[in-house]
Structure formats: C-alpha cells, structure tokens
Design a protein with these regions (language model features):
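Non-catalytic beta-strand/loop surface segments
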Residues: 1-17, 40-75, 111-166, 190-233
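Active-site SXXK
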Residues: 23-37
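M16/insulysin-pitrilysin zinc metalloprotease superfamily fold
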Residues: 36-39, 70-103
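Helix N-cap motif at beta-to-alpha junctions
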Residues: 72-75, 173-178
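Short amphipathic alpha-helices in soluble, non-transmembrane regions
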Residues: 81-86, 182-188
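Non-catalytic accessory/assembly modules
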Residues: 91, 95-105, 109-112, 116-126, ...
C-alpha cells in the first residue's frame, strides 16, 4: 500500500463562542476558510490536495472547528504550506462572504427547514436542556444574523480565533515524529500568536426536574422522540 498521512487542524472556536447576534458565524467562517488566500486563490487548496491523491473536509462543533486532510505522504509539505498560508491570511472579499452566506442558508433550508424532523435532536434538544445562551442557541444560525455579517466581522473573527496559539495540529501516518515536527516548524514557526477573547463560563447547573418539548412537523410522516442527558464536560 502507498504511504499516507492524516492531518487534523483544530481551532478552539465553535458554536459556544459565537458572539450574540452572530449565530451561525463559526460555521460560516468554516466555509470562508475554503475561499482562497492572497497567495493561493480560490480553488487552489482543493486542486492541490485532490491532484495529489488526497481528500479534505471541515466541520464545526460546539467547542472547536476542524479541518482534515488525508493524502499520500508525498503531499505532506504542500498541505502544510496550504494550512499555514490560510492561517496567515484569507481572501476577505465581499463577493466571497455574500456567496458563502447563501451557501450556508441553503444548507439550513435543505437540512433543517425542508427536511423531515430537521435537526430537532440537536438544536431543539439543546434549546430545551440548557439555560445559557452559549449552549442553547442554534449553531446553524438565523438568516437574520447571517445576513447581518459584514467583512469586518469576518476579519475580526479570524484575528481573534484563528491564530496558532488557539490551534491544535495532529498528524498521523507514514511519517516520523521528528520529520513531522520539523516540517510543521518550517511552515508554522514564523506565524505570530494573536490575542484571543476571554472564554465565557458555559457551566450549567444540574437539572432538578424533567424538561420536555412537544412540537409538530408538517414534513414528518411518523412521530419521533429524542432523549438527552446532561453529562460532565
């Protein structure tokens, strides 16, 4: 089999850290990370990785946003260059932002608004179970908040949360730790740290009684039930 590697670059920014009035912003920014940089225009990231026999993806979670790559080990250095390049700067154009707002809104239409049950087992359960806004709000975001996002907001979000001091990079596969550390230092070592905002207190008090929510879904043909328990973070 051909030697391969897997890479995961995770930033400590997810739904919980979104500012109020900017619901869905962490997910929107995940999309912006694929819109190119001054050095690698839009499409370069995918073209280099896929052209080298690799695949890539990204996802936004409650506590982090991650970007993953799996490729032949010969592509490790180009991939590290690409990741370091977009950690330094992105193409913050109004055109890219407007385009990705519509992409995210279409995801909401497809996965939530026009899909049987939507994501009730995620968004509606969280909104019922938790008291603090950071835990309870819909991470997909409202159309109103997404439409209100400006290029200045994107730049501020990037500077606040996408520095090397707020990231964790993991590499596995057919590469030695010494080789991996040396290559990472080569491409990321000169990127300066950035100040990050104070993390909010997201701790919740234990529930003292059952919480329930009942709702109708005109798109669903049969009933559905979701049950959740609060567990230690």
């Amino acid at each position: 089999s051909a030697p391969t590697f897997g890479l995961c670059l995770a930033f400590r920014i997810g739904f919980r850290l979104e500012p109020k009035g900017r619901t869905g912003f962490a997910h929107l920014f995940e999309h912006m990370m694929f819109q190119g940089t001054p050095n690698a225009p839009k499409g370069t990231y995918d073209r280099v990785i896929e052209g080298g026999g690799g695949v890539n993806n990204g996802s936004t979670r409650y506590d982090y946003t991650n970007y993953i790559v799996s490729a032949p080990v010969s592509a490790l250095e180009p991939v590290l260059w690409l990741e370091a390049d977009r950690m330094k700067a992105l193409d913050f154009s109004e055109k890219n932002l407007s385009n990705q707002k519509e992409v995210v809104k279409e995801e909401i239409r497809v996965n939530v608004k026009n899909k049987p049950y939507g994501l009730f087992f995620w968004t509606d359960v969280a909104g019922t179970a938790f008291d603090k806004w950071e835990n309870a709000h819909d991470g997909y975001g409202s159309f109103t908040d997404l439409d209100a996002a400006q290029v200045a907001d994107v730049k501020s979000f990037f500077e606040s949360y996408y520095g090397p001091n707020n990231a964790v990079l993991a590499i596995v596969g057919d590469v030695t730790p010494e080789e991996a550390f040396a290559k990472v230092e080569k491409y990321f070592g000169s990127i300066p740290a950035r100040p990050t905002p104070a993390k909010p207190d997201v701790a919740e008090k234990a529930n003292t009684k059952e919480r329930t929510l009942s709702q109708t879904d005109p798109l669903a043909n049969v009933p559905a039930v979701a049950v959740g328990w609060k567990l230690p973070a």
